[in-house]
């Protein structure tokens, strides 16, 4: 009887380990895809309310080579 309980617990732990590993890998894939989309996107202008020198310098538009290196409405 003890052997069956131990075997059941080990089986459950193994299944949970597999599920957690699969979810972590899926999250990694989603992070890579989202990161790629974020790198590819470029906003046309920065809203006037968020328009500071720091925001202009570090905006997606400024950092990406294929975007214009201006700050839009600043």
Curated annotation (Swiss-Prot):
State which residue ranges cross the membrane: none
InterPro entries the UniProt entry points to: ShKT_dom
Q: Mind telling me which residues the site (Important residue for binding Kv1.3/KCNA3) is annotated on?
A: 46, 50, 59-60, 62, 66
* GO MF assignments: potassium channel regulator activity; toxin activity
Enumerate the subcellular locations listed in this protein's record, separating them with semicolons.
Secreted; Nematocyst
Record's keyword terms, sorted: Cleavage on pair of basic residues, Disulfide bond, Ion channel impairing toxin, Nematocyst, Neurotoxin, Potassium channel impairing toxin, Secreted, Signal, Toxin, Voltage-gated potassium channel impairing toxin
Q: Which residues form the signal peptide?
A: 1-22
Point out the annotated site residues (description: Key residue for binding both Kv1.2/KCNA2 and Kv1.3/KCNA3 (occludes the channel pore like a cork in a bottle)).
61
Q: List the disulfide bonds.
A: 42-74, 51-67, 56-71
Task: Give the pro-peptide residues.
Answer: 23-39
Family, as annotated: Belongs to the sea anemone type 1 potassium channel toxin family. Type 1a subfamily.
The entry's protein name is Kappa-stichotoxin-Sgt4a
Which organism is the protein's source? Stichodactyla gigantea
